[in-house]
């Protein structure tokens, strides 16, 4: 049997991996490549737990290669840089988000939209250039091309800032691209979870009036008092939904469970935009009449390019925007995944990798 290219990698690493679609994690020894001339190696301090990690470890999208080491909200301290690296130096705080590679030549890459490159390489679970499967941040060491490294602002929290590398850019980018960042606009956020609470924070920082749409009345007090939303609509209450018809310029739909979108479209003004950023594991039904009636738009958005991700992190640092997190040791990850499946987290788990990942 041919050897895996990973066996040639000299950097010994320790992580936690799922080895089958039960999604159960256990310690996992593997190797990373040596630091190339344009690579940055860093010691992982924290890694956020994204809902997509749960989908991937259970192979719900049918693309998972086992064993899988998830994690694409990764922050740490640089320990080694290649000879041609100019972006960061040893000792700097850095982050890596959802991408670690792209072709760097296509129109999308040329326009700083590596996230839409057809040859993009995801931070974990995807084949890398050398034929190995990329391993994510549930591990003690990362090596990445400097182009995909995010510089971390001084005094910006590492633990609460880490989820912004996915949840932050996933919501910041569509707010900017679709023009929903103008003061005075009325923006809806469907779902108040890991993505939704960050979307609220960015939308408020842009000066918009924010309406949270949720199935959970229990989240109203938190949304109004802690997050400062302007309106809260319970989507299962027909009277509340009727009162909100035609009031919103746009909606960021963060829900990752299958859900009807006709009620959301009714909340939009004419020419309003429904932007889907959640990842349900089943198709959503697309109604045509509400689109035609008000020239409304349904669109999608996926993370952001590296330039925009750096812009987002800098904006967040300037405006004191962080995720609300529960910091956990890495040996709690199986329990955390069970809780995530039940939406029992407010609002994002973050693994304290440095303090809790130890050789077994």
Swiss-Prot record:
Keywords: Metal-binding, NADP, Oxidoreductase, Zinc. Zn(2+) 1 binds at residues 50, 72, 166. PROSITE patterns: ADH_ZINC. Zn(2+) 2 binds at residues 103, 106, 109, 117. 66% inhibition by 5 mM Zn(2+). Its cofactor is Zn(2+). Optimum pH is 9.5. Active from pH 8.5 to 10.0. Expressed in leaves, with a very low expression in peltate glands. Gene3D superfamilies: Medium-chain alcohol dehydrogenases, catalytic domain, NAD(P)-binding Rossmann-like Domain. Pfam families: ADH_N (PF08240), ADH_zinc_N (PF00107). GO terms for molecular function: geraniol dehydrogenase activity; zinc ion binding. It catalyses: (2E)-geraniol + NADP(+) = (2E)-geranial + NADPH + H(+). Its EC number is 1.1.1.183. One of its GO terms (biological process) is alkaloid metabolic process. CDD domains: CAD1. It is an enzyme of class 1 (oxidoreductase). SUPFAM superfamilies: GroES-like, NAD(P)-binding Rossmann-fold domains. It comes from the Eukaryota. Belongs to the zinc-containing alcohol dehydrogenase family. Involved in the production of citral, a mixture of geranial and neral with a strong lemony scent. Reversibly oxidizes geraniol and nerol in equal efficiency. Also active, although at a lower efficiency, with cinnamyl alcohol. This is Geraniol dehydrogenase 1. It comes from Ocimum basilicum. The lineage of its organism: Eukaryota, Viridiplantae, Streptophyta, Embryophyta, Tracheophyta.
């Amino acid at each position: 049997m041919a050897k895996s290219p990973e066996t040639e990698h000299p950097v010994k690493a320790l992580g936690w991996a799922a080895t089958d679609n039960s999604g159960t994690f256990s310690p996992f020894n593997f190797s990373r490549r040596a630091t190339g001339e344009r690579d940055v190696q860093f010691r992982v301090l924290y890694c956020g737990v994204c809902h997509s990690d749960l989908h991937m470890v259970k192979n719900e999208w049918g693309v998972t290669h086992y064993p899988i080491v998830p994690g694409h909200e990764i922050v740490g301290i640089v320990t080694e840089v290649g000879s041609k690296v100019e972006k960061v130096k040893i000792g700097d705080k850095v982050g890596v988000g959802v991408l670690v590679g792209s072709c760097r030549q296509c129109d999308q890459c040329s326009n700083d939209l590596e996230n839409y490159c057809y040859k993009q390489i995801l931070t974990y679970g995807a084949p890398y250039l050398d034929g190995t499967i990329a391993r994510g941040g549930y591990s003690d060491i990362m090596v990445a091309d400097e182009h995909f490294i995010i510089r971390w602002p001084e005094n910006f929290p590492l633990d609460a800032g880490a989820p912004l590398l996915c949840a932050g850019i996933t919501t910041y980018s569509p707010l900017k691209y679709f023009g929903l960042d103008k003061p005075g606009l009325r923006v809806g956020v469907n779902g108040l979870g890991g993505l939704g609470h960050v979307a609220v924070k960015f939308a408020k920082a842009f000066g918009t009036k924010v309406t949270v749409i949720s199935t959970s009345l229990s989240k109203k007090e938190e949304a109004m008092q802690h997050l400062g939303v302007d309106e809260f609509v319970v989507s299962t209450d027909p009277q509340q939904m009727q009162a909100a018809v035609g009031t919103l310029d746009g909606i960021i739909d963060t829900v990752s469970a299958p859900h009807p979108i006709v009620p959301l479209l009714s909340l939009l003004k004419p020419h309003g935009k429904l932007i889907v950023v959640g990842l349900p594991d089943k198709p959503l039904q697309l109604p045509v009449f509400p689109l035609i009636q008000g020239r409304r738009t349904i669109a999608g958005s996926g993370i952001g390019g590296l330039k925009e991700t750096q812009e987002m992190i800098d904006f967040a640092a300037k405006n004191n925007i962080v995720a609300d997190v529960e910091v956990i040791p890495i040996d709690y990850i199986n329990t955390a995944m069970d809780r995530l499946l039940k939406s029992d987290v407010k609002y994002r788990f973050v693994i304290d990798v440095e303090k809790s990942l130890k050789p077994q």
